[in-house]
Amino acid sequence: MLHSWFGRRARRGWLLACAFAGATLLAACDNAPKFQNLDITGNTQFGSDFALPDTAGKVRTLGDFKGKAVVMFFGYTHCPDVCPTTMAELSEALKQLGPDAAKRVQVLFVTVDPERDTPALLGQYVPAFDPSFIGLRPADDAQLKKVTKDFRVYYAKVPGKAPGSYTMDHTAASYVFDTNGKLRLFVRDGQGPGPWVHDLKLLLD
């Protein structure tokens, strides 16, 4: 009897957790595919597209990468830890996927610090991790505010010790769209390439 009571409590707790995370997460708990990262399929709280210039000035949208899984990361080139670590993890993940699968993945680095991240600097920094990676730079403050609001990304300038210096505090996570352009995953930083490889394989199958 006691075991049954605890069983009911456990099941109720699980269902409440799924309900709290949203109906789309509940579906993800019950149906394949079983992602290792947070499944946000169907969650309308996040943006579904973007229109941002790349380092050559060409405006890119999700439609430019039709047929590819798209990884969208928000960061900045002067970032001391999270940003280069995430880019390195993604670079390693593509190597582990193999060349054929890697061609079907597009990594986008959206700067939250366009003041310092000039097209030239961004154009050197991002492809250094992998030649296929693309840097996107909001053209002005309004465009930066729009894309970060659409994807619920936090960012703030933090003054440094030296006069005029600063760092950027920002959401340390990535968004992943599937090959049909649907937003599917929210990926927190610092997990290593393993979960990336696992989930990208599911999206590419």
Short names for language-model regions:
Residues F50-V70:
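A short beta-strand-turn-helix
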Residues K103-D117, F133-A142:
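Thiol-based oxidoreductase modules, predominantly thioredoxin-like and allied folds used
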Residues L2-C18:
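Bacterial N-terminal signal peptides that target proteins for export
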